[in-house]
């Protein structure tokens, strides 16, 4: 929110009246007196100018700080992370095929690159950061707990599989890499360490068993060694590289390729090796390249002075034990055995969880915020969060994170609380949390510059309350982590109040997402990015008098969670205050009054809306032969319920369980869900009714539909959760809810498994006409909720 500029008033300076000249009463003899030289004679005019400029700049800075104060973070919560978190290595670089670091800003970064050795001189296509353009047929963690170990397969099209397994141990880690590629092919694998802070230095060792030495203020002295399996040694050569240059973190792979040279020995195939001419004895980037055959296996061990080297059999045993414990807990929690799922469905289920946990990331640094018209650094932040997609969205998203943690909490509720606490620490003193956490240079490298700044008046769905609702109603979690829940309660309430105040609507019980563009002409329906539903149709002509159904429902859920927390951890006044908010926001009669249409039999947004708009080519002024697609309104807009767009947004009263189980309105909602002309498909619920004029409609000439027909798993999960609730409640519609639940679950599981088997991935969304996966892939985010959908404890 912009502050009003205060006028700066200066006191008026009145000119003094001239003094009257007095006549002397006596004549005084004049005695010449030596006058001092004017100060300007010994003071340079250049110096005067510099001083004036400095004074002006100082005044400007002080005035700017007064009128435009900086964003200020809340004080961090007491640390709830494990004591050894800064020293414990994990896969906290989710954008990489295989990368490790610790949860400390001082951690060195470990990474792996590889490419197939060309037979002719050319620039190799190197794999490093996850990239859809690499066109890999599949890569996923098939077992991973997000803390102690992981097992991953990376498939190369028609060439074979690279397997990466890892474990951590005290202050170090060990990894095993296996290449099982097509015969006759050769591969180069590059392993590197890079420094994040000045005090970290690396040196080269003398052989592979002592390949790197390093020092770091966090870890102390450490070494990295490579151990090749016997049959691998015979067909392996290696080269090393060390530099003290400052390399941009997103250009590591380019730097490696630029410093690679072709070596063509007589009667030998062409070999690419690293340039080993080193001008530095120590540096902040160090790499070793292994030239391997198609079948190879080697171990990587990073250890501090305090630890002994790990033997191959020790790695194998520890990995086996951790894998066993993971699988045992997995089955105890989700209980999929004996449920008649196919092998493909069971494989997809475990991959969905493992990818979610194996893609949890750690970031440190500032993000950028557009505050009072100026982009400012905001931070520093420490973010511990899952991500939606390793290649496309490898960073924290506030609206996604609540869904991520719905799954993670089932295996590791402590990890969920650590993630929620890190998001609460990103809050500013007013209660705002950035909707997208693009923190640090690695995260920024994956985002176009114009999309990096966040706006501090824009909210996002408070989905963390969705997972908190489950945590505070779980007796085991409450008993074990009461202290953490007590710490989180004031932050959650602050966030809740910020949303209620800044996103308020025209009346007390209505709310409006900020950020819609009232003047844009090139969009069919101006987007509501803050809602998370992006191009889902709202009122066609944005105004301050509109209000939004989903936001009202999110706040109703949040009020219930806060009341539960206040009862356990707040004062009597806290409890009374939250009870009042809960009663107001969960009042069904009020919801019906504000949002229900008896004629259309649905809940809807309200606003300035036209039922007759279209994107049409309009001649460009001054260039009659050129056209621009603009919104053309054939019928004047009026203030009304937006009843020509029924879809995901309109299901929120049911999804968040605000409709009484005996209300006829519930029957109407169930009927619309099951109607193939509206939302029902054989693959899941589509995002908007087929009868809506917005179904599969482009929002601009260049923007295809997004939330206008395709099937999204997070909302289907919310619908299933509510169906399970209503099927268990007394009322005339419980049998109908049970039947729809069973059919919808079966359709989702069958289609996602079909697409997983066909493509090797979970996808961002799915086509409502064919069931095919769409958008970015692999989508390790809320599409992984398919595992909860498959389990019987979907909503506990």
UniProtKB/Swiss-Prot annotation:
Residues 68-796 are lumenal. Its EC number is 3.2.1.106. One of its GO terms (molecular function) is Glc3Man9GlcNAc2 oligosaccharide glucosidase activity. It catalyses: N(4)-(alpha-D-Glc-(1->2)-alpha-D-Glc-(1->3)-alpha-D-Glc-(1->3)-alpha-D-Man-(1->2)-alpha-D-Man-(1->2)-alpha-D-Man-(1->3)-[alpha-D-Man-(1->2)-alpha-D-Man-(1->3)-[alpha-D-Man-(1->2)-alpha-D-Man-(1->6)]-alpha-D-Man-(1->6)]-beta-D-Man-(1->4)-beta-D-GlcNAc-(1->4)-beta-D-GlcNAc)-L-asparaginyl-[protein] + H2O = N(4)-(alpha-D-Glc-(1->3)-alpha-D-Glc-(1->3)-alpha-D-Man-(1->2)-alpha-D-Man-(1->2)-alpha-D-Man-(1->3)-[alpha-D-Man-(1->2)-alpha-D-Man-(1->3)-[alpha-D-Man-(1->2)-alpha-D-Man-(1->6)]-alpha-D-Man-(1->6)]-beta-D-Man-(1->4)-beta-D-GlcNAc-(1->4)-beta-D-GlcNAc)-L-asparaginyl-[protein] + beta-D-glucose. Residues 1-24 are annotated as: Disordered. Gene3D superfamilies: 1.50.10.10, Glycosyl hydrolase family 63, N-terminal domain. Residues 70-130 are annotated as: Required for endoplasmic reticulum targeting. Residues 1-46 are cytoplasmic. The chain crosses the membrane at residues 47-67. Residues 1-10 have a biased composition (Basic and acidic residues). A motif (Endoplasmic reticulum targeting) lies at residues 2-8. Glycans are attached at residues 153, 340, 517. The keyword Translocase does not apply. One of its GO terms (cellular component) is endoplasmic reticulum membrane. The active site is at residues 534, 764. Pfam families: Glyco_hydro_63, Glyco_hydro_63N. GO terms for biological process: oligosaccharide metabolic process; protein N-linked glycosylation. The keyword Ligase does not apply. It is a single-pass type II membrane protein. It is found in: Endoplasmic reticulum membrane. Disruption phenotype: RNAi-mediated knockdown reduces lifespan to less than half of that of controls. Reduced paucimannose and complex-type glycans and increased glucosylated oligomannose glycans and fucosylated N-glycans. Chronic endoplasmic reticulum stress response is believed to be due to the accumulation of triglucosylated free oligosaccharides as a result of impaired glycan processing. It is an enzyme of class 3 (hydrolase). It comes from the Eukaryota. Belongs to the glycosyl hydrolase 63 family. Cleaves the distal alpha 1,2-linked glucose residue from the Glc(3)Man(9)GlcNAc(2) oligosaccharide precursor highly specifically. This is Mannosyl-oligosaccharide glucosidase. It comes from Caenorhabditis elegans. The lineage of its organism: Eukaryota, Metazoa, Ecdysozoa, Nematoda, Chromadorea.
